[in-house]
Structure formats: structure tokens, C-alpha cells
Amino acid sequence: MKESHVSGRHSIVQFEGRPERLSCETGALLLREADERLGLSRDLARVVEDKRDPSRVVHSMEELLRTAIMLPALGWRDQDDADFLRWDAAVRLAISDRRGISALLNSDKTEAKGLGSQPTLCRLHEGLSSDRNRSVLREFLMESAARRLKAGNGGHRQRYVTIDIDSLPIEVDGSQPGAEYNGHYDAEIFHPLIATAAELGDILDVKLRPGSVHTAEGGLEFILNVVRTAEKSLCQVAAVRMDAGFPDEETLQGLESQGVPYVARIKNNAVFDAMAEPYLTRPRGRPPTEGRTWTCEMSYQVQSWSRARRLVLIITENPRELFLNHFWLVTSWTEDEKHAEELLSCYRQRGTAEGVFGELMDSIEPALSSNRRPKSHYRGQTIPHRSGKNLSFAVNEARLILAALAFNLAHAVRCVAEKAFQKGLTIKGLQEKIFKVAARVTLHARRINIILASDVCERWLTLWSKINCLGFANGRA
């Protein structure tokens, strides 16, 4: 036992260090329960290609995947954090393959193994960076959303899902392969594509791209793949919603040829401004004290388009501004299928995707910092390997997909918490108010006691029972 005394004006504070099993991240147990119900780490470990020598394996692939997914979900973004939390009792209980007391104590009463170290996680990310493993990670990213949906929907797919497509700047430090200066964001960034499900709030797919690419580069292939996969496991019909950077002829024609409904904003230019000019007049009468919006329908063929398409002019009035504002939407829906007001309402719900992007960057904070400098020789022999630049980029993409999986797992717990407590909750709030709970772990002959403060214990028991009742078992609702 270590003691330290600090004298103050009115009292003496004493600090003691005791060999007890304590934790500041008890929320890892909630994530493990949700992960068990989803079957995420278990099923993912079965299909990921593991090229390690079995005779030298200390941590199973399932344990390493749990570590790589749960730590970001708890708010720990760096690989070094695994060393800091290596002996945290609750985190070890949550991540270990062993059940019960054996997760913390060996049969000879010695302390069981801790979490995988930072070098171990580096090797994991490198192993997951192969083309096959990244494809598997992507499939399970979509599958995680599908399983959560079916758990609350009687095992059925949803009838209709809107997929939001956008790019996201991720700033990096140092010289990372693929990170390039982007003048629009005035920073060194990666510029990945991200697809989210508007009605669900889950991330469906991500694709890492160099920082200087245009917003729409590689967009069509990415979108069609997401839609194809979503309609197999998530919904019967998937529609696409895009921002102004995506609707070029290739993308629109590709979506129409596959029968995928879409709505997208179009960038204003001199031609569109001239077309809108006759409609930018206020209606007769006294201006209202609140803003108002009206729409105009037309069909028009842009010079770069192969045919005319339905355009909707959106005009907005702000009482505090002298001039009217306007923007344009293009859509594949006919007026009978979705009239202008419905279309505008649909597009404005794109704010849910912006919220997902913000939460991903604020709460999970993907750390894309792999810059491999591989050895060229070992004991006089040349080592065959992929180029360091290409491998580092692939490792960063694998880390981004794992961050998205961490977001979906935390989101699954967040959705249960919102229903249990009847109030909204952000991922950051979930991490700070529910996950970061101090606890003492005590071991008895046949059980483990998690001792929480009395004011949080009741809330925790409610949330635990709700997660445990979800129909995630064996990956089926």
C-alpha cells in the first residue's frame, strides 16, 4: 500500500494505492453485451483471414477485434490507449474470450493476461488491410446495421431506407500516404466517402480516398454497391440522397439505369440564376413575421446531361434579409410519385447524416496515422512485402472501417438507452454519462461482483436488462 498526505487549510487529504481491481470504463461491459447480442466480433472473427502462427498466438482474433472496436466506442482513439487500459478489470472482462472469473484469474490464482498491446494492435491492423479482409469488414459494417434493425423489427427488413452519400474531411498530422492538401478545406486531409442510413442512424459503408480527389470521384461505384448490399439485408427499396458535389451525368445516368430513386442538390451557376430570376418575386400582401418557402417545377437539360430531368426550384424568404434565397434540386421521382413539397422535406432530412458525421468525428475520432517503414532485409534475407505507401493507405482504410463499426456498436447501445430513459442522447453523452462509470470488481468462488455507486446502479440495471432482451442472439432476430 502506498500513501500520500496533502495538507490543506482545513483538512488533510490522504491518497492510497491498493492492489484492488478497479475500473473507470465499466461501460465496456454494456458494449460487450450488445456485441454478444449482435454476434458481431464472434462472426467477424470466423471469416477474417488470420495468417498468424497458431503456436505463437496469445490473443485470439475475436479478442483483438473486440479491442479494436470497443476502445474507440468508449472514446479511446489511439492504439497506445490499449497499454493504458491493459489491466483495467472491467475492460478485460468485456474483451476476454474466457467466461467468469477465469477472465481475470488463472486456475493457479495468478493474474490472467491483459489486453493486447499497442504493437499487437498494429499487427492486427496490418493483417486486416488485405483486400479480402477489408471487403469482409465492409460486409460486417452493413450487417451490423441490418442485425440491429431486424432485432427491433421482428426479423424483417425495412420497407424503405434513404441512403445519404457524402464525403468527409479527416485531417491528419505528418506525412501520411494518401493524405494530400485540399484547397476547399485548407488542410492536409483524407477525403473518404461515407454512406449512412437516414432512418436508422447507422453507418453503412466507408471508402478511404486521397485528400485531393473531387467529391464525386468513385462515387457511382460506391453508391451502387451500397444500394445493392442494402437491398439484400437492410431494406426492400433504397433511395439515395446526395449533396451538390455528386450529381454529374455519370452518377445520375448510372442511378437511373439501375432504377435507383434519388434526390440531389445542384450547384448554382449563372445559367440557373437566370432561370430562377423570373420566380424570385415575393407574393402580394404584407410580408410575414416568419420565413416562408415555395417551389417551382420545371424540366431542363443541362449542357453536360444526356437528357432533360426534373428540376425543382426552392425559394426561401427570410424576413430579416432584403433578397430572396434559392437553390435547385434534381430528382428521378416524378411529380406523381413525390410532389415538390414532399421532395423538399425529404432533402432537408439530410441533416440527420450531418449529425452522424459530426458524432463520428467528435466521439469516435478516427485516428488515421499509419505510416509504415518496413524492413527490407532480415538476417541477410530480402523480405517480400507490398510497398509501404500502398500498405499504409490500406491499413488506414481498415482503421476507418473499424471506427465505423465502433460507431455502430455505440449507436446500438445509445438507441436502447434512449428508449429506456425516454430522452435523447448523443454518443459523446453516452460515453461520458453511462460508459465512464467507476466500479470495483470483486471475485468470489462462483461469481464476479461489479460494485457501482448507488445513484447509477439502478440506471445501469435498467439498461443492462433492455440490452439483454434484444433479439440479437446468434446474429438473428
Which residue ranges define each predicted feature?
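C-terminal, non-catalytic "cap/extension" segments appended to globular domains
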Residues: 382-396, 410, 414-477
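Short amphipathic alpha-helical "interface-anchor" segments enriched in bulky aromatics
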Residues: 34, 82, 340-391, 398, ...
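Acidic, metal-coordinating catalytic cores used for nucleic-acid/nucleotide bond scission
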Residues: 241-248, 268-270
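An anionic, glycine-rich sequence signature occurring as long contiguous blocks
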Residues: 1-16, 261-365, 468, 472-477
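Dynamic "connector" segments at or just before major functional cores
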Residues: 1-233, 255-258, 438-477
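Short, glycine/acidic-rich hinge or "gate" loops at secondary-structure transitions
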Residues: 83-85, 98-101, 238, 417-427
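Structural motif
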Residues: 54-63, 319-320, 390-400
